[in-house]
Amino acid sequence: MYAIVRDRGMQYRVEEGQTLRIALLDAEPGSAIELGEVLLIGGEMPLVGAPTVDGAKVLATVLGEEKGDKIVVFRYKNKKRYRRRTGHRQEYTRVSIDKIVVGANEQHVTNTPEGETNGA
């Protein structure tokens, strides 16, 4: 099972056990976080939210912080001997996806193929 989650404007496809690099969070390594904006739960019976899936959340553990690759910004003005070279390294938080939780009603719907009942 996988999920599409949105975190501060970015969308990520996550699965249980996956490690992921997201924008910097103010969280200590080893702490548990919750990604609550679940847009889609995929699998045999996908569940699409409008815009989010009610009661669904992704539980993750913070592994640590890291920096991304350097982006070089070079500015110059033609024929004027004006040259400026600067760089930027974006900071990220590495998280491990522990569990994809679906609410009780949605779990009931996802396990039943269309046309069948769950005996309840």
UniProtKB/Swiss-Prot annotation:
PROSITE patterns with a match to the protein in the record: RIBOSOMAL_L21 (PS01169)
GO-annotated cellular components: cytoplasm; ribonucleoprotein complex; ribosome
InterPro entries reported in the protein's UniProt record: bL21-like, bL21-like_sf, Ribosomal_bL21, Ribosomal_bL21_CS
Pfam families per the UniProt record, alphabetical: Ribosomal_L21p
Gene Ontology annotations of biological process type: translation
Secreted as UniProt keyword: no
Keyword rRNA-binding: yes
GO MF annotation list: rRNA binding; structural constituent of ribosome
This protein's UniProt keywords: Ribonucleoprotein, Ribosomal protein, RNA-binding, rRNA-binding
Function per UniProt: This protein binds to 23S rRNA in the presence of protein L20.
Similarity comment: family membership: Belongs to the bacterial ribosomal protein bL21 family.
SUBUNIT field: Part of the 50S ribosomal subunit. Contacts protein L20.
Record-linked NCBIfam families: L21 (TIGR00061)
Protein name: Large ribosomal subunit protein bL21
Gene for this chain: rplU
